[in-house]
Amino acid sequence: MEPKFILGSSSPRRKLILEYFRIPFTCIPSNFEEHSVPYHGDPVAYSQELAIGKAESIVKDHNPEGLILTADTVVAYQGKIFNKPGSYDEAIEMLKTLSGQTHAVITSIALLQDRKLVTGEETTQVTFTQLPEAYLGRYIKAFSTLDKCGAYSIQEGGSLIIHNIQGCAYNVQGLPIKTLKHLLLEFNVDLWDYLV
């Protein structure tokens, strides 16, 4: 019997990735307060704590039957993390900082079912082109990037600002399929079974 998947996210990109791989799921966005988790300088540990918090929040609030999948993506550069910008001005500053530089995109995944918790993460290195300041505002407005970590999107105009990617492109979109495939095996679920 196929497991019932619960995606603990309202991210349209994560939904599209699951749909692309024909994984059936129900969406129950988490109410977890991400700002309640302090950042102590380790972006992997931070994103992992957020992913776990989201999964546990869904159990607490809804107690659904099924395999809960949550994820958290952060952009990290020189010891700082860049979440979703709080304003247009913050988005401009993020893009200025990342312009011409290489940063890490880290996504942590948490899978939770019947008190069994499995976690994993993926890191991708992304290098931006040198971005003319005059174009930053245009990019943010044209591609509505205020709801995206680091104030940018790989799939929406990413080719205008990204010079190079080393690693998983799905990770930069918010759900690294290779990592998810590996973690699902812990629940005896093989993604290949959905590709028929």
Curated annotation (Swiss-Prot):
Domain of life of the source: Bacteria
Cytoplasm among keywords: yes
Keywords tagged on the record: Cytoplasm, Hydrolase, Nucleotide metabolism
Biological process terms in GO annotation: nucleotide metabolic process
Keyword Chaperone tagged: no
Disulphide linkage map: none
Subcellular localization, as worded in the UniProt entry: Cytoplasm
Gene3D superfamilies from the UniProt entry: 3.90.950.10
UniProt-listed InterPro entries: ITPase-like_fam, Maf-like
Residues at the active site: 72 (proton acceptor)
Catalytic activity: dTTP + H2O = dTMP + diphosphate + H(+); UTP + H2O = UMP + diphosphate + H(+)
Major localisation: cytoplasm
EC number: 3.6.1.9
UniProt-annotated site: Important for substrate specificity, residues: 13, 73, 155
GO terms, molecular function: dTTP diphosphatase activity; UTP diphosphatase activity
GO cellular component: cytoplasm
Names of the cofactor(s): a divalent metal cation
PANTHER family from the UniProt entry: BIFUNCTIONAL DTTP/UTP PYROPHOSPHATASE/METHYLTRANSFERASE PROTEIN-RELATED, BIFUNCTIONAL DTTP_UTP PYROPHOSPHATASE_METHYLTRANSFERASE PROTEIN-RELATED
Protein family (similarity comment): Belongs to the Maf family. YhdE subfamily.
HAMAP family, alphabetized: Maf
Job description of the protein: Nucleoside triphosphate pyrophosphatase that hydrolyzes dTTP and UTP. May have a dual role in cell division arrest and in preventing the incorporation of modified nucleotides into cellular nucleic acids.
Name this polypeptide is given: dTTP/UTP pyrophosphatase
Upper taxonomic lineage: Bacteria, Pseudomonadati, Chlamydiota, Chlamydiia, Chlamydiales
